[in-house]
């Protein structure tokens, strides 16, 4: 997992596909977009623009992906995201791996939380369990952009 703020340069060299996704986040005015999918580089790099309401932690299931990494970016609002390493010990609640590249767990072993503010992003790789859209202080409307980057595009 990588955690940062879009206004701060990343001191590390990242794969081209991740840099392209971060450039999209840096240069797009998300107040001008409607919720939905935006293709950045076909199905290899695309963004989901989501308007959500944060919920209690127990109402959101932890998740992982295998074919895509997630770059979760908060355009406005506030949220907490649960994070953990996928130890292989989490009980599967629902597997939609073939249809949507997502596995939901009942719970997440050794979970910690990060706090997201507008401009924050978190990059989740296949080994990173994450539980997005959790209440930080109180229920809040958020706009979140999830950029999906195909693992096959990482160089």
Where are these regions (language model features)?
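A short, N-terminal "cap"/entry segment at the start of jelly-roll beta-barrel domains
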Residues: 1-49, 61-64
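Short acidic (Asp/Glu) patches
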Residues: 50-67, 98-110, 131
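Glycine- and acidic-residue-biased ligand/ion/polar-headgroup-sensing regions
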Residues: 67-69, 73-81, 88, 97-102
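A short beta-loop-beta micro-motif enriched in histidine and acidic residues
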Residues: 42, 58-70, 89-93, 109, ...
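Conserved metal-binding segment of the jelly-roll/cupin
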Residues: 114-133
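Short proline/glycine-enriched turn/loop segments at secondary-structure junctions
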Residues: 134-138
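Short beta-strand/loop turn elements enriched in aromatics
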Residues: 40-48, 80-96
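A short hydrophobic beta-strand segment most commonly corresponding to one strand
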Residues: 121-123, 139-155
């Amino acid at each position: 997992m990588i955690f940062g703020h879009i206004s701060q340069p990343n001191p590390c060299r990242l794969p081209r596909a991740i840099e392209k996704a971060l450039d999209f986040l840096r240069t797009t005015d998300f107040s001008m977009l409607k919720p939905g999918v935006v293709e950045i580089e076909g199905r290899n790099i695309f963004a989901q623009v989501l308007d959500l309401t944060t919920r209690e932690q127990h109402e959101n299931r932890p998740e992982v992906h295998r074919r895509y990494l997630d770059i979760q970016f908060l355009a406005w609002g506030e949220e907490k995201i649960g994070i953990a390493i996928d130890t292989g010990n989490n009980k599967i609640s629902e597997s939609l791996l073939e249809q949507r590249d997502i596995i939901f767990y009942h719970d997440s072993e050794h979970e910690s939380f990060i706090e997201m503010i507008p401009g924050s992003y978190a990059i989740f790789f296949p080994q990173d369990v994450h539980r997005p859209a959790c209440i930080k202080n109180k229920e809040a409307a958020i706009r979140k952009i999830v950029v999906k980057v195909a693992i096959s595009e990482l160089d």
